[in-house]
Amino acid sequence: MPPSPHMESENNTIMRTKSYFITLRTIYRRELKGYLGVPFGWVILACTMALQGFILQAVLQIMTQATGNGVMYHMLDNLNFWFYFIFIFPLITMRTLAEEERQGTLEGLLTAPVTTTQIVLGKYFAAYTFYLLLWLPMLLYPLVSDIGNYYTEVRYGIQPEGSITYMLADWVGPYTILALSGAFFVALGILCSAMSRSQIIAAILSTCLMIMYYFIGRVTELWGEFPAAPIFHYLSCTEQVKAFASGVVDTRPFVLYLSLTVFTLALTKRVVDYRRWTR
């Protein structure tokens, strides 16, 4: 008995979906290999680890005073942290599409039997994965410090301030907001790379936009409170990070950053589509 048209339609849909994700995975692996398979990616990782260690050392000196806040709060409230945090994203994303243009491989990619969405998402998820990998060492530094202090207090008969479970839970908020804000900043960097034919210009453009977004949250510090101040408080990445680092988990940053990420990726798709049509 031959299969019904309905079953054939379902099978075709399944096959197309499977083929779509196989192609997306291929692009993702290719791009991720471009980060981990070349010295440039490891240089970024090494520099990030060194800066994280430097900031942790400064934070531990600050914490010799009773502040009532944890290690992660002070690390994210450090100006040096924001300096290198902003500059990480241009380094990660400036090569995604601008480098393809320079090497002459973008022509082949845009004329290949792949959709623009697959290209954008494959590059985005690879860059975002690499960004998340950069924070794994940062998880170990303060965690080892806290656990070491905990067992030292227990050994010398001092009542610990919190359990190890509490310490581990103390990292959930900070890493959540770093993942959320990073999702948007990576998307913004890829958009700048799509708009430029030069890595340097893409890096400068994305850096300027991220610095502008950073200072949006500082408007109330410069001008004080005014009727529109709640909007700037809502957009302030510094206030969000400090709130999450203090253990205050708010749903509004989830909505904000996920919406901005989707919008930026959609805009990137339109830019790549335009470059595809004009070839």
PLM features: what roles do these ranges have?
Residues M1-E10:
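C-terminal coupling/interaction segments
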Residues N11-L45:
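Aromatic- and glycine-rich beta-strand/loop motifs that create alpha-glucan
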Residues P39-A50, F125-P137, L205-E221:
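Hydrophobic alpha-helical membrane-insertion segments
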Residues C47, L76-E99:
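Long, hydrophobic alpha-helical segments
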Residues P90-L110, Y124:
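Transmembrane helix boundary and interhelical loop/hinge segments in multi-pass membrane proteins
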